[in-house]
Each structure stands twice: as structure tokens, then as C-alpha cells.
Curated annotation (Swiss-Prot):
GO biological process, alphabetically ordered: microtubule cytoskeleton organization; post-chaperonin tubulin folding pathway; protein folding; tubulin complex assembly
Organism for this UniProt entry: Saccharomyces cerevisiae (strain ATCC 204508 / S288c) (Baker's yeast)
Disulfide linkage: none
One example GO MF annotation: beta-tubulin binding
Extra remark beyond the main annotation: Present with 704 molecules/cell in log phase SD medium.
Database matches in PANTHER family: BETA-TUBULIN COFACTOR D, TUBULIN-SPECIFIC CHAPERONE D
InterPro entries with a match to the protein in the record: TBCD (IPR033162)
Biological function: Required for microtubule stability. Interacts with CIN4.
Name listed for the protein in its UniProt record: Chromosome instability protein 1
Amino acid sequence: MNNIRALLDSIQSGVQTVSPEKHQQTIAAINKFQDDPALLDTILPRCVPLLTKSFFCMSQRDQKLVAELFYNLDKISHSKVLKSLDTSIFRLNEILNYLQDRASPSSFSDVLCVYLNLSWLSVILLSPYAFKDKFNKTLQVSSRFENYPICIPPINKIKAVLYFKNFTDAFDQLPEREQANVPFLNQFLKLFIQSSEKANYYFSNENLRHLQQVALSNDGIKLLPKLFQISFNHGSHDILDAIVEFFHDHLSSNSTDTRFQLAHSFAKIAKFLHQADPASFIELIDYTIENTVSLLQAPCDSIDSNELHTSLLIIAEVALAKILPIDLVDRVLTLIIPKTCHFQKSHFQIIKGHHIRDSTNFIIWSVIRSNRSNSLSPQVLQSLLSHLLINAFFDPELIIRYSSFAALQELLGRSNKSLALNQNDIALILQANWKDLPRSFEENSGLIRRLFNPENTSKSAVCVWKVFRDWSFNWNLLENLHLTTMKLNIDYNLVPLIKSKLSSPALLQEVLNKAGSSVTQNCQILYLYLKLFENDVNCPKISEICIDIYQKKIKFQLTTQAKRQFNDNSPELFQIFVILKYWQLTGQNDFNQELFWKFVDIVSPQKKLNLYNEFIPIIQQIISQCVSLNYTRIVQLIKSDNELTCRSICHMPDQEKMCSLFFSQFPLLSPQSRSLLIGELDHHWDVRISLLPSNSYRKFRNIIINCLDDYTITQQGDVGRLVRIQALKLMQSHPDFLSGDCDSINPKLTRLLAEPVPEIRKLSYQLLASATSQITVLSDSSILNFRHKQGLSEEFWKGYAVSAGAIHFTDSQLTSSIDSFIVYYRSLSPSQQLELCHDLIRIIPSAKQIAESRIRDRNKDPLTGGMRFDTIKFTIHCVKFWTRIMESGLVVLHPNFNFQGVFAKFYNLHLLDCTTLRVSVIKFFPFLAISCYHTMRENADQKNLSNIILKRLLVLVKREYAATKSKFMTDQNVALQGMFQIFLELGVTRQLQALQVACQKHELANILESDITL
């Protein structure tokens, strides 16, 4: 409540003092009340007048702010906002003049200003005056804004009121286009509901037939209640019959919106008849209920769920209107609700019916809200409690759990006198977690067993327990199409219930006598027995039944294609799951192995399913207990990157074959499969891998170490990072991995520590740092400081160059890397700065190294199959790193820095046939020239390197220019920009002007070296 009060205070403050600073905060506070507008209604009579009273005296900016606040309040509580507006007719001229003088809106804020004034105008026109003198002007100014959809509703209200007050003779006086305008007619006819006598002479029979034609369409449904009332008073029975017939003909509409409109309009007609003709009302509602009961007699698959949905919505709307007789309420709750509360049907393996269950909850909620529940028998209320508890906790759809819980709250709040539940028990129910379905089953199954078990003899508890048991053992076990829920029910309801002291021998016998009528149902029963067997319930007897069902009743036909995608409720996938579970638990080592591998092939692509993770241990255990594995088939599946087979390599019973298979197939796998397999190695390292003969163990260890160098790139990006991450996790899980030969591992960890992937940085740091020097926030600066204490190495700078010279990066990542480096660099002594610069040049591959890497197939590691870091790509990272640090202000270097040697190295790089590298180097040349010029300020050779670079850039410009006949290419553009950059940075005007003139006159081919050198 304190939070609500604070929000209301915030809104009132924002409305009282409208300002840009508070504006968004006020709107956010208003929108917090979307789910419960009644709380906001309390302050609207004060807020709305405050907003509008000085509207016409405000600046345009403030008018827009006010209009936006008004619009947001209006969205939450439209009718209450309109009722709170000032109705003084003295405001009329101000509003009309504002709308008349208003230019066409150019922004949404402008439209909202118009909307506010049109809404205000529609309220003032309800005053008891005809406004004849304002009639034409009002229609004229309002019609200017008919092209803005948001303005249409208030404009229709304005026109309806004006026509109603001024065209008083006959309907034919209305403009012809308005006679078929449904939104306008809806507002217009609404005015006649309060003036039935006027309607009797205003509408002729012809007029009513015309309105009938307009209303009897999907667009005109909202007109039907008003037309029905006018026609009833007019005595036009043929129109009344046509309207009722229209409802009956359209109950099965495919449109959900149409079904809701039909139900809402039908309820309004019923409400009118309840007052005007009670006998007809009873007949109409009784027919609707009987028709619904009749619908539910058919099998679910043959029921028209659209018609059923509309019928349920109608019943709910009528119940909410508090006009449904108690005997009919009782019929609905006893004959309809028990059948619709779990309604579902399958359509092309998609389970439908949640809209039926939702409308069922709507009925229950409406009955309780209408206070009809006070007249219901305790037995009916107990039945409702049972259904709502089950649906709120265990329905597969979250939206149904929401609506069930809302109805359950109402029931417990309004009818507990009859239910007689303990207040502590109510608190436990209302505090239960039901949003996550598996967790809800896990926690709330136990809650129901505790609160409503047979030891609790209250009538409510007895009823809930009976319904809960029937739902668990009968409907959910054999009729539920949602196999995920069925499985959760077995895991968390049936097995614990049978195992607990609450069960009796008769209950277990009831379970043992279950029989299915299809392969899927037999699999469901078999799964229950397997879970009982797994939990040591009557093992010998259950084991016999499992074998009997499997051998006699599971006639599995493999019809599916391996690549087909299932959903969690696919019967065929569940059948496969149960058969595999049977093989696992019964220890069948002579199972149908060919069928098993087909199952593995089918299941492996289903990684997105919740059930997938349960397949993994089952398949692994079956493989581990098989005495004669088909290794040829295994190799085929591994080569096709079958994930489940890859995950199972470590579970193969033959140790020698397991090693042979791993070493031969690991390099052939995709990075994703390699990372999964390393994860499996992690789980088996201590119990299996570390116990292998030393040669095999060493090879496994070397593979993991080499995986730290996996930089495989695909269309999905750096997928090698998955392998690097998993290898680091394995090392972290087994501290003794790092004991011994650390010389080969630490340099790799040092490089990875500086790389851009946060998880790789964190894991590398944790492996390198001692427990006492752990850093909470792992930033670029903290990494630099940590490595400085440890001693910086070239491997570290290779990793840092990859981060700071990244081709793809976020602004924050790049800024952090470069800024942290510059701060670190400036903290060093001059000699350390020089050494660091030399290190950063040394790590750049030479042109010769790049050429050699292209000739030899050295990029793929034969041990792991991973791609080593691409030499050219790494070189580009290094060049970009140098460019960025100089671009960010690191211009003056140590005077002993070998600028000429650096230029020679970069010169050779830009000669290579690699466009991206060449362009990167050409972009760096001007930075190198500028840095050398400023660093060697006191040196006689200050200008030498700058001139060499300028000459080279000129050669590139001329060569490209000559080759393309004045068409600018990438290299030429970059080289030209570089020359301009040097001239501007060094402040030389003669050379700058010469280059500008050559560009303007297209005479770049004629420019001389003497024109551009310093």
C-alpha cells in the first residue's frame, strides 16, 4: 500500500506542476495502474481539472505535456477521466477556437492536444442545450481531424450528440454516409436508449430494417444490443428474431475478437430482457446453457471449440451481470465446469483448448464476483475449489494458471465461510509458487497432500482429495494429451502418493490394473511402472509387469524421419523416451541395437525440447551397459555430428576403444560438439581419464591444452570460443591439471586473460591468480595491473591486441581497452615505455611469416581439429591496435623508438595481396608519420620518415588514379585522406593547398613529390 500511495502522490505532483523534468516519471507512475484502474480513479476528480484548467493560457510545450498526461490517464480509465472534465459551457468557445486555429498536427503530441480538446468538447455538448448556433462550426472544426484514428471516437460522440439534439424529426435527416457508419451509429443509438419514446417515432420500419442490415455483420455486432432494445420498444418482432438468429448462426466464428464481441453484446441483450421480459430472458439463457451441455456430450475431438468458447463467454458475461438465476448457476457449475476445466483437443499434434479453460475460469470468477456464490451449496463450492487448485497449480498453460489463481483468490476471499479452510492453509495456498510448471508440480503436489490428505476429515478436504486423486490417477494418466504434464504428474504426484503412508494396498492394486487402449497410453502406464520400479516400489511384481507390457503391448512402429522436429508433447517422441527408459532400468544388454541407434539419430536434433536433457543420461547408461556395441554405427553418427553420440563416448565400456574413438573422431567434430565432449571429459576426468595408462592420459591432457588455441571461425562467428571456455572450465575443475608442465599452459592463459570474451578472461584469471589476489571486477585496467605485477609477456600483448584491435566491437569495450592501455602506458618509466612499444611491434607477424602461413597447411591443429588463430587476421588486429592508441592521443613515443624499422615492417605488409590488411596499414601510415615528426622534434631527421610516407602515399594515389582513369578506389581514398591528415596535423599550408588544387582540377596524376614533401 505504501508503494501505491507513493505512486499516487507522484502523479498528483506531476499533474500539479507540469514540467519536462517530471514528465516521464509521471507517465511511468500512471501506467503502473493498468492492471487495477480503480486505484487511480480515486485521484482523477482532482487531477483532471488541475491538468485542463489553464490549458489555453499555457505555452505550446506545456500544452503538449498536459495532453500526453491526459492521454495516459484516459488510456487507464476513460469514463472516469471524461466524468472529471469541467462541463461548463463557457469553455465551449475556447475549445472551438483552439480547434479552428490549429494547424494540421505535425507530431503525435500535436494530435494528443487535439484529442484532449475533442474529448472535452464531447462532454460539454452533453449539457442540456441544443447548441444550434454552434452546430455548423462544431461539425466543421471537428471534421478537420477525421484522418487521425485516435480522434475518431470523440468526433463520433460529438456528431451523435449534435444530430440527436438538432435532427429531431426522423432518422432520414442524417447525412447518408453516417447512416452506415457503425462507430457513429453506436454512439447515436446509445442516446436513444435513455429516450425510448423518441425512438418510437424517430425510426420508421424502413429505418430499422436498414439498421438491421448494417448491424447484422461482424463489424456491426456492437450495435445489436441497442437495435434490439429500440426494436423491442417498437414492436418489430421480425428484427428481434433476426438478431437472435444472427447470434446463434455466428457462435462458431473463427475470430476470437468476434466471439468476445458476440458474448458481450449478447449479455447486454440478456440484461435488457431480464428487466423488460423476464420469461424471454429465462428462455434465451436456458437455451444457451442446454445447448452448451448438449455440445459437451460429444467426444472432445468432434466438439466445435469455437462455438463452445462463445457459449461459455456468454454464460460468464451474464453471470457477471448478476442476472443468472441460481438454479441455472448450479446447472452450469455441475454440468459444464467439470467437463470444460480440463478441455483439450489435438489438431496436427498441436494441443488446443486453452481458450475453453480460460473462459471456464471466467465463468467461475464471474459467479463468485457477482456474489452468487453465497447461494451455492457447500458441495458445489468445494468442487470449484478442487478444480481451481488443480488448474492454478498444474495446468500446462501459464495464462490458465493466472486466470485460475485469480478465480481461486476470489473464492477463498468470498466463500471461505462455506469452505471452512484454516487461515494458515489459505495463506500457504495464496503464497504458493505456480508460475514455473515443473517447480509448481514439485512443491504444490506436496502442499495438496499435506493440506487435503485423508487424515484431514473436513468436507472441503475430502472433496479436494477425491477430485485430486481422480485427476491424478485417471484423467491425467490416460486422457491428458499434454504428455509433459502427464509425466510431471507421475513424477511428483503418483509415485510419491503410492510410496507414502497415504496410499493403501487397494490404491496400488488399482494402479496395477490400469490398461491402455493405444501404444501411447500403454507407454504412459509403462512409464508409471518404470518410475515405481526406479523407486523400489514392489520391485519383483512391478518388474514382471514392465516386461509384460513392453513385450505384449508396445508395438512400436518407426514412421518418423530422423530430421523431423518434434514438440514436447509429440506421442512418438514420448514412446521413444519410455522404450529407452525401459532398456535403461531393466538392464537389457541384448536390446534391439539397430532401433536404439535410430532413436539416437531421431532424438539428437531435438535440443530445444525440455525432454531432451532427460534423454542424455538414459542413452549414456544404455551404452555403458551394452556388451557388444556397434562401433561402425557409432563412428557414422559421430561423423554426422550427432550430439547424443558425442556425449556418450566417455560412457563406452571398452576403455581401449573409447580412447581410440575419441582420438580419431575428436578432430573431426564441429566446435559445438567438441565443447560438449570436453564437458563430458570434465565429468569423467577423475574417475576414468586420470586412471588411464600414462600415454593415453598424456594425449587427453595435450588435447585439452591445445584446445586453448581453438579459434575456429564460421558464419556464427568465433565458435572456437566454446571450446576454449570448456577447456578452461575443465582445468578449473581439476586443480592438479596445472601441476607439473605449467610452461606450456601459462603463456596460453596469459594470452586468454587479455582477450575480449568476458567468460574466457574470468576463467583465465581465476586459473592464474592465487586465491588471495582475486579481483572482484575484472576490468581492462585491473588486468593490466595484475599482469604488470606478474611480469608482462608477449603472449599477454597478443591477447590484448586482439581485444583493443578488434574488428567487431562495442563502443564501451573498445573505449575501455584503449583508455586503460594509455593510462597504463603513461604510468611506466621511459625505458619501460620503449620496451613495451618494441614488444607491441615484435608480436606483429612479418610479411614473410604471413606468406609462409599461406603456403603450409598450418592453420588446423591435427590433435584437436581446431583452427589456429588466423595470422592475417591477427596482423590486422595489431595494426588497428596501433592506429587506435595513436588516434587516442599516444603520439609522442620514446626518442629511441625505431620508427624506420617499424615503417619497413609495415611497408612489407602493405605489399601483400590482402585488401583488408593493406587498407589497415595505409590508414596507419599517417599516424606513424605524425608520431615520428613530433617525437623527433629536436632531431635533424625529423621530417625524413614523414616525407618517405608522403611519397609512398602519393605513389598509391597516382597508381590507382592512372589505373581507374579518375575513378576513386578504396586504396586511393585512404591514401589521399592520409596525406590530408598529415598536412592538417603538422600545420603545413603549401602542401595542403597543392593537394586541394590537384583534387579540384582532377590533376592528381600531374602532382610532383616536391609539391607534397615537407
